[in-house]
Amino acid sequence: MSEVGTFSKILVAIDGSETSLKAAEYGIEFAKKYNTQLIILHIIHIHAAGLMYTTESTFKQFIEKNKKESEEWFNAISKKAKEQGIEIKTETVEEIYSVPGAIIKRAEEENVDIIIIGSTGKSGFKKLLLGSVATDVVRYSKCPVFVIK
């Protein structure tokens, strides 16, 4: 981790929601300002209970649909980043248990200096100040978290 006020590596977690895509724009701006590495991460949340009631082909379709969707987001974000002279690393992770836990784990593995995340995701609870994923990332992350409204 870098010293306070400087960044060498930034992780932005996205789910395709308006606030997460806005977070990616902030990530690009931070990466440009601080000349840092930028990682864009999407977690595919696999609901464990749903696995019991689905076929293998349906499960594969679900994963492929989500990967295709995330590739579209990554491509749009990459295009904006390249226009700013920023190279990014993109990653999709499949997670059965905890989305916030998966975000924090990747942040720790990558030794990032800051996580940028949207305040609310695709769950539809727009009236909440902070969604459950953002709340848990803020609560349990060892590095600073920048939450975008």
Regions found by a protein language model. Give the residues of each.
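Structural beta-alpha unit
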Residues: 1, 5, 79-115
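Small/aliphatic-rich secondary-structure junction motif
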Residues: 3-57, 80-82, 89
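Aromatic/hydrophobic pocket-lining residues that form π-stacking "cages" and hydrophobic walls in ligand
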Residues: 27, 77, 103, 137
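Short glycine/serine/threonine/alanine-rich loop segments
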Residues: 36-37, 86, 112, 143
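Generic structural signal for helix capping and beta-alpha/helix-loop junctions
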Residues: 47-48, 98, 124
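A short acidic, glycine-rich active-site loop
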Residues: 58-72
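Gly/Ser-rich helix-loop-strand patches that form or flank binding pockets
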Residues: 108-149
